Swiss-Prot record:
It holds the Pfam family CTP_transf_like. This is Phosphopantetheine adenylyltransferase. It comes from Alkaliphilus metalliredigens (strain QYMF). Keywords: ATP-binding, Coenzyme A biosynthesis, Cytoplasm, Magnesium, Nucleotide-binding, Nucleotidyltransferase, Transferase. The keyword Cytoplasm applies. One of its GO terms (biological process) is coenzyme A biosynthetic process. Belongs to the bacterial CoaD family.
Length: 157
């Protein structure tokens, strides 16, 4: 069974993330959306809230699950029996950072590969940070996130 892990903070999960998740689910037998606790970020949603939102979004897909982790991603991948880390790329600037991470992960654990999926061009500018910034100033983010996330965000502001 081919297992892929799609890690991220997903704060909030965007339509760009969902596009990558759906496409990965067509390639891998099992996809684990792995929500990480990032101590360097001040999240809009708690870890539990992010997991709950993603669980509702992925409900129609039998081969996608959601989990959370902290620590080294490569250790988590080993623990889950995953041989692939899935990363979405929006721009060249994403590639530079993600390549460094992929090379470090390969050095730490050569049996786990990193696979890059190019973001659909309609989402190439989209990031959770930008969605939060627009929402902070009462801008309309309805085309960037699923309805359930939009509702959850409106309760936070």
């Amino acid at each position: 069974m081919k297992v892929g892990i799609y890690p991220g903070s997903f704060d909030p999960i965007t339509n760009g993330h969902i596009d990558i998740i759906k496409r990965a689910s067509e390639i891998y037998d099992r996809v684990i959306v792995s929500v990480m606790q990032n101590p360097n970020k001040n999240p809009m949603f708690t870890l539990g809230e992010r997991v709950a939102l993603i669980e509702q979004i992925i409900q129609p897909y039998s081969n996608i699950e959601v989990d959370c982790f902290s620590g080294l991603l490569i250790d988590y991948a080993r623990e889950k029996g995953a041989k692939v880390i899935i990363k979405g790329l929006r721009a060249v600037s994403d590639f530079e950072y993600e390549l460094q991470m992929a090379l470090m992960n390969r050095k730490l654990c050569p049996e786990v590969e990193t696979v890059f999926l190019m973001t659909n061009s309609q989402y190439s500018y989209l990031s959770s940070s930008l969605v939060k910034e627009v929402a902070k100033f009462k801008g309309d983010v309805s085309e960037f996130v699923p309805e359930i996330v939009l509702q959850a965000m409106s309760k936070k502001s």
